[in-house]
Design a protein with these regions (language model features):
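Transmembrane alpha-helix boundary signature
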Residues: 48-63, 75-84, 101-119, 186
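Transmembrane helix-loop junctions at the membrane interface of multipass transporters and ion channels
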Residues: 53, 106-120, 185-190, 217, ...
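Structured cytosolic domains appended to multi-pass membrane proteins
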Residues: 288-465
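Cytoplasmic-side transmembrane-helix entry/capping segments in multi-pass membrane proteins
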Residues: 31-40, 62-64, 84-96, 159-170, ...
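Membrane-interfacial segments at transmembrane helix termini in multi-pass membrane proteins
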Residues: 248-307
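Structural signature of hydrophobic alpha-helical transmembrane segments
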Residues: 1-14, 51-71, 126-141, 187-198
């Protein structure tokens, strides 16, 4: 295959990836977007193989790698629970970062295979590209592993605040920059692995102090990092498709991070600096009655059956209990009785961007019933019932009313303005941000303590009876 034709094929592949992003931007076109992405990737892989012209043994290794990776991917796709999707995304990001490190190492030890010079005579531009790629890749690798452990509950979701962490991070960053300069001048293997070691440490230290409330931003941020790492691999390999794809992923992840930060009324820098989610004080505890109104499934069934409009607000509690199908059944039962039902989604609900949308799509909830915060917030005042399922921090009135609250200014869903708020939660404990929710103590709120799926199922049964 000629290089000109390969460049054209890579361009077509890049266009397919752009169309994939376009398709994935809306639930109704998401399947089409996935198809575009798969076609684009197939074109890129076939073009690369035809351009490389591997030997028989090399081709056998490539096929074996594709079989192992494809088999593992197919197995994961079939077995993974939708509730574990944030962990899966973080895991995939770590693999991209690791790939960047390994490709950079291969290029350093065998530069002739990459067309970037000979050992001891690698082009300076290639060394700079290689260094940046390995630094970003290593940071992405360990940062994504920490995010995975936090999301999977294997590490505390609370911020781990190390003393002088900002000084340490700054020192590591300066050290990486200095070592990159040394590597370009010396091509030292030792310096290369020092860059890897410092970058791995920086990846851990950047994510460890970030609390669970900021996890959606962290996931999108790591998504951006993985994209730039892939672009770095593309420059090292001289692969146009990887450069295009990496730039697309990197820029889209950065934009998504900005949107997430805007949805939390926080700056991107404040998220990176970490620490949010460590507060344990009960916001507004001095001027509210601490008593709560407890209810049962029968109470909730009566209130919703006699309502004319119900807004369902899913949160991480729905994901943990895998209650999305039960919620869909409840909505169908309400609609049979002539009740208007809508779903309200907060942009940072759950543990990754679009987490709730994915779960509702799995339960085949009609897309025209799902609304974002800015589109539905004004309707809570006209709703008879707001049915909240574990959406804790994103419904906390302290963010709107209490200037002393750590989450003050974060846009929330105004569920407290509904005539009645039914809040399903396992306990009265604070949310992932570590802040008490003043919504629990309002006269219009009825707490339904228990597992979200069982409670919703019990409400459906009570309505049938």
């Amino acid at each position: 295959m000629s290089e000109n034709f390969a460049a054209f094929a890579y361009l077509v592949s890049g266009v397919m990836f752009i169309m994939a992003l376009r398709g994935l931007s809306h639930p109704t076109t998401s399947r089409q977007g996935n198809t575009y992405g798969m076609v684009g990737m197939a074109i890129a892989i076939v073009t690369t193989l035809l351009l490389a012209k591997p030997s028989a043994s090399g081709l056998a290794m490539i096929v074996a790698g594709l079989a192992i990776g494809g088999g593992a991917g197919a197995y994961i796709a079939r077995k993974i629970a939708m509730t574990s999707m944030p962990q899966l995304v973080a895991g995939f990001h770590s693999l991209v970062g690791l790939a960047a490190v390994l490709v950079a190492a291969a290029a350093l030890y065998a530069p002739h295979a990459f067309g970037i010079g000979e050992v001891g005579e690698i082009h300076a531009q290639a060394l700079i590209e290689m260094s940046l790629g390995v630094a970003i890749g290593a940071i992405t690798f360990t940062g994504s592993i920490i995010a995975f452990l936090k999301l999977d509950g294997r590490m505390s979701g609370k911020p781990i605040m190390l003393p002088m962490r900002h000084v340490i991070n700054a020192a590591l960053l300066i050290g990486i920059v200095v070592l990159i300069g040394v590597l370009v001048a010396s091509e030292s293997y030792t310096v290369f692995w020092l860059i890897v070691a410092l970058s791995l440490a920086l990846g851990v230290l950047l994510i460890v102090p970030i609390g669970g409330a900021d996890m959606p931003v962290v996931v999108s941020m790591l998504n951006s990092y993985s994209g730039w790492a892939a672009a770095g691999i593309g420059f090292t390999l001289g692969n146009l498709a990887l450069i295009i794809t990496g730039a697309l992923v990197g820029s889209s992840g950065a934009i998504l991070s900005y949107i997430m930060c805007k949805g939390m009324n926080r700056s991107f820098i404040s998220v990176i600096l970490g620490g949010f989610g460590g507060e344990t004080a009960a916001a507004g505890s001095d001027d509210i009655d601490r008593s709560v109104k407890l209810g049962s499934a029968d109470d909730a069934a009566f209130l919703m059956s006699n309502a004319s409009k119900v807004i369902i607000v899913p949160g991480y509690g729905m994901a943990v209990a895998q209650a999305q199908h039960a919620v869909r059944e409840l909505a169908d039962k309400l609609k049979e009785q002539g009740v208007e039902v809508k779903y309200a989604i907060h942009p940072v609900a759950g543990r990754m961007p679009g987490h709730m949308n994915v779960l509702l799509a799995e339960a085949n909830v009609p897309y025209d019933e799902v609304f974002e915060l800015e589109d539905i917030n004004s309707e809570f005042a006209q709703a008879d019932v707001a049915y909240v399922i574990g959406a804790n921090d994103v419904t906390n009135p302290s963010a709107r009313d209490d200037k002393s609250s750590p989450i003050y200014g974060m846009p929330i869903l105004d569920v407290d303005k509904a005539r009645t708020c039914l809040f399903v939660k396992r306990s009265l404990g604070s949310g992932y941000a570590g802040i008490d929710n003043t919504l629990f103590y309002k006269d219009s709120t009825m707490m339904l303590l228990g597992d979200a799926k069982k409670m919703t199922d019990d409400i459906v049964k009570a309505m049938e009876n």
